[in-house]
Regions:
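Accessory recognition modules or surfaces
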Residues: 1-6, 12-13, 33, 38-50
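Conserved N-terminal helical subregion
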Residues: 1-5, 20-22, 47-183, 229-232, ...
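Short helix-loop capping/hinge motifs at secondary-structure junctions, enriched
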Residues: 64, 182-194, 256
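C-terminal domain-closing interface element
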Residues: 350-373
């Protein structure tokens, strides 16, 4: 295979795609808007599932390195009620490797490896149908042409409009993210509360989730139902003001739970958006989508796993093919849509139960619902 291939986006989907192509000695151009791999904090931690994210890393040839970095103990999950009573306390067995955790930054570095990324390349538009191929427009006025453009450019994809007029909609839930560093030394009581993995608390139309990463770093997510303009447009630079609003929103919850917000350092508002559950498009030769660009869904552990596997699967199929790569892309899209629709349905229903008027619905979800395959 020697076609001109570009992937837009250096996240999990784009890097998995590029890494698998590199493994098969297939050239690919990676265009990433960020100025470099450390341009901004890489985020929290991910659990990579057997048959999804782990399978993708196996295809990329980095599964052994993943196991050296991952935290199987991070699968531990504790659920509390708002007065701090422990309702569920699940801990993985010594050989449980179903969904081990890894920091997003570690995963990024693992996939980057030998992949050559063109940093600081801001794609503004993708135009298929040209006589010479698909044209990629860049913010500085340049244009480049490729035989295949893979949009792995996330929720605000600049590639998606070439295939679909659909845009993500607000789910009705906003998350405010904050962080605690060196928690075992600075806040040992909170470290014990969180344990080795995550702790989640569900109230009426709101939830509080704390997730341990490596090096004593913890991400805390305050989630609540609110109109889109109620909190999301407020300036988060004044951490004290944001903290006060959150403490008022979660007033009446147990003091140790509120300490997760009191000791948070910086705050980021993240309104949760999603694409329609069964988002598809009429196939367009030379362009396709992966990950959030294709099927943005509520953040319940599926998105990154699907993105990784899609990137790896498409790259593997293209590397193995000897015919028209467009036929390969058609087959891939059908498979991706079917699998993504199952997970989008699951995560959409999950968000409705986890942040709902009935906190018991969240507990029931953990007790009864099994994720799709």
């Amino acid at each position: 295979m020697r076609h001109r291939i570009a992937v837009i986006g250096g996240g999990p989907a784009g890097l998995a795609f590029a890494r698998v192509l590199h493994r098969h000695d297939c050239p690919v151009t990676v265009l990433e808007r960020e100025s470099g791999p450390d341009a901004r904090p890489p985020g929290g931690t991910l659990d990579l599932h057997e048959g999804l994210g782990q399978l993708a890393l196996d295809k990329a040839g980095v599964l052994a390195e993943f196991w050296a970095l991952s935290r199987p103990e991070g699968q531990a999950m504790r659920i509390l009620d708002t007065d701090g009573t422990v309702l569920r306390d699940w801990r993985p067995g010594p050989d449980d490797r179903a969904n081990p955790e890894i920091d997003r930054g570690q995963l990024r570095d693992l996939l980057l490896g030998p992949v050559d990324v063109r940093w600081g390349e801001h794609v503004t538009k993708v135009v298929p149908g040209g006589r010479d191929g698909v044209r990629v427009h860049l913010a500085d006025g340049r244009e480049e042409t490729f035989d295949l453009v893979v949009g792995a450019d996330g929720a605000r994809s600049r590639t998606r409009p070439a295939l679909s007029a659909v845009t993500p909609h607000y789910t009705g839930v906003t998350a405010v993210e904050t962080s605690l560093d060196d928690i075992d030394t600075r806040h040992p009581d909170l470290a014990r509360l969180i344990g080795d993995g995550s702790v989640a608390v569900y109230g009426v139309n709101r939830a509080l989730v704390a997730q341990r990463g490596s090096g004593g770093h913890v991400k805390v997510y305050a989630q609540f139902r609110a109109p889109l303009d109620r909190h999301t447009k407020r300036d988060t630079a004044d951490a004290g003001a944001v903290r006060s609003r959150l403490l008022a929103l979660f007033d009446g919850w147990a003091a140790p739970l509120l300490d997760l917000l009191r000791h948070g350092t910086e705050f980021v508002h993240r309104p949760l958006y999603a694409l329609p559950v069964a988002h598809t498009w009429a196939h367009v030769p030379g362009v396709t989508l992966l990950g959030d660009a294709a099927h943005l869904m509520p953040p319940l552990g599926a998105g990154a796993n699907l993105a990784l596997l899609e990137g790896a699967e498409l790259a593997e199929s293209l590397a193995a093919g000897t015919g028209d790569p467009d036929d390969t892309v058609r087959v891939f899209e059908e498979r991706m849509w079917t699998r993504a629709a199952r997970w989008a349905s699951f995560t959409t229903a999950g968000l409705e139960r986890l942040v709902s008027p009935d906190p018991a619905a969240a507990l029931a979800l953990f007790d009864r619902v099994q994720p799709p395959g």
